């Protein structure tokens, strides 16, 4: 705060040079964070400290042009965190997998979304959607199949139904992991929190995405109005050019 949050301004400025949007992890930590004395081997002597709150975000919004932020607001949130999120105007996260957790009244169900949020089928910390479905049992499995109208269909069809559920929601932004588009199981999971081992080792290879998959990815994006403006304009031009070519061909045939 003494230097106008210089480190944060530099970091976020650089991030916006690299990415379209930046997700701020553990958003609640900017309201309150648990501080443990350096060198302690346990958290017993830790205590809650106040974070910078909106003072930091006002500074970032003022210093960085076109700053786009996603606030990771998952888990337990205090009233003051919710107030900070609302004041910031940043969209929070909605994870579809969290919607089917034994309750049929979850705030993660799409019909409860408002526009200012980002929907994910799952994140890097979740199972892939296929892996999650394969491990789901009992009431939760029944409810998710009912919700997406996918009763007896193969699991890959259910994965695509969940992708459509996310894309068709009112959320301003939808994020679909490539593992879900490819209908990969948990062998392609990115990270299992609080574990050691093969985390962050999965890689996408060039031959994993077929032209058919690319077509389906683009089509569901188009159908639900989520194509980038440039792509929409290009598609409109291509359609117009095709129609003009057909008209010229018809004129030639008539003559």
Language-model region placement:
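Structured C-terminal cap/extension of enzyme domains
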Residues: 183-238, 243, 250-255
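Alpha-amylase-like alpha-glycosidases and glucanotransferases acting on alpha-linked glucans and related
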Residues: 1-175, 179-186, 192-207
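Generic secretory/membrane-interface signal
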Residues: 66-67, 119, 238-245
